[in-house]
């Protein structure tokens, strides 16, 4: 074997090592995205259970997530809960989602307003979107603003912002 043959074999081995390293990294990120999706499915199930408890009149916690009905009598002057207070209680230390974190970027928040390439911390975050009925077609989706009032019957979609800053739709629920 001549010297150029050794260089060729060295380059081939280096490429194999690089492909293996990149493949392992992609697999690990994919596993974290799949784990986040499972966490999101549990969040959707929790909200569906929350809605059932609300309809039955059972005790509900946290109180800050209880929507107010627009048609219900006797609720004039009642405090209207906002999305900010609800999501802070849900992800707070005593909230049901306190164990859910951003698995892709552990120092980033677990939820974000939108999936944005310019907001690097939104990768791996849960995105809550308000769905608005559209008579001409499918509902339009927009971010749940922190000041959004929680009214009964509001439709919300939960998505996950993946590593490429694209939304992975997990599920929809109704408050």
Language model feature labels by segment:
Residues 1-45:
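Amphipathic alpha-helical segments typified by the pilin-like N-terminal helix
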Residues 47-101:
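Short, glycine/small-hydrophobic-rich surface segments
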Residues 119-175:
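Short, surface-exposed interaction loops/tails
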Residues 63, 68, 74, 97, ...:
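Generic low-complexity segments that are intrinsically disordered, proline-rich and/or Lys/Arg-biased
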